[in-house]
From Swiss-Prot:
Keyword list, A-Z: Apoplast, Cell membrane, Cleavage on pair of basic residues, Membrane, Repeat, Secreted, Signal
UniProt keyword Zinc present: no
Short motif SCOOP motif 1, span: 48-62
Domain of life: Eukaryota
GO MF, one example: receptor serine/threonine kinase binding
GO cellular component: apoplast; plasma membrane
Signal peptide limits: 1-27
Motif (SxS motif essential for MIK2 binding): 54-56, 79-81
Record protein name field: Serine rich endogenous peptide 6
Complex and partners: Interacts with MIK2 (via extracellular leucine-rich repeat domain); this interaction triggers the formation of complex between MIK2 and the BAK1/SERK3 and SERK4 coreceptors, and subsequent BAK1 activation by phosphorylation.
């Protein structure tokens, strides 16, 4: 009978410790709006999409001169290889 009470006491002690530790850890964690981490990228009209938060938790400084990592380029440029691949320009006549 003594071992039965001891095993129940062990479960009660573990339960009390979990009830004490779990709320303390929740109160110390800050929401994403406070830490500055973003889940989505930032769209810039002339520059594509800038990637969101980095794995280290330090988001890049965003200003007008910062272009970040480009995920999408929104402008088409002519080929520099001169090998074609596009349409021939139509003659005006």
């Amino acid at each position: 009978m003594g071992t039965k009470c001891y095993s129940k006491l062990r479960y009660v002690v573990v339960l009390v410790l979990l009830l004490f530790v779990f709320p303390c850890s929740l109160s110390q964690s800050a929401p994403s709006s406070v830490t500055g981490r973003r889940l989505m990228g930032i769209y810039m009209p002339n520059g594509g999409i800038i990637a969101g938060s980095s794995p280290s938790g330090q988001a890049p400084n965003i200003n007008n001169n910062y272009h970040g990592r480009r995920l999408m380029i929104s402008e088409a440029r002519p080929s520099k290889s001169k090998k074609g691949g596009g349409r021939e320009p139509e003659s005006p006549g």
